[in-house]
Amino acid sequence: MQTELFEVDPLSDNRKLYARAAEALGAGALVGIPTETVYGLGADALNPEAVARIFEAKGRPSFDPLIIHVHHGSEVEKYTAVPEGLKDLVHTLASRFWPGPLTLVLPKADIIPDIVTSGLPTVAVRVSAHPAMRGVAKALGRPIAAPSANRFGHISPTSASAVQKELGGSIEMILDAGACSEGLESTIVRPVLDEKGKPSLELL
């Protein structure tokens, strides 16, 4: 397989490119997509066969769940089943930290395939601050499952060239937006209800 590389010009309107990447994802392709933290290996999160290709390409164990990316915090309700007692906390976190490098682990909605969560009842959700990830997610109209775009156990890539070196020939497309601004994985927290039914946070 030949991996196509497309440059994302920060000074241009990239909507046609994002639409092209979204079309590829919709057809079951894998696409390397930049975020502000690291490059992600994207697949249509609602397509179990495409998600299975992520595990295959990365050599990732099937028991290791994936993060999903959505275009906007308002979409979280579609893909999660947050209990009433946690909704205010989740809304506060989303309003304060999204878009940005924060991942929330929340009870999943039935629409999310079990392969994404490795059979767990929760799903990790994020809204990236990078225009490429958000733009592709918006164009796709569905969540993007996207762990780091590298072989399992290797260093997470912060450039398109690193993605090409790791996964070139096993994925269809890479969007090259230069180096990631953060270069570190996102912070992961799980909102929970304590024994008294009060909302709190667990840092994962």
List PLM regions with ranges.
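Active-site-adjacent structural elements in enzyme catalytic cores
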Residues: 1-204
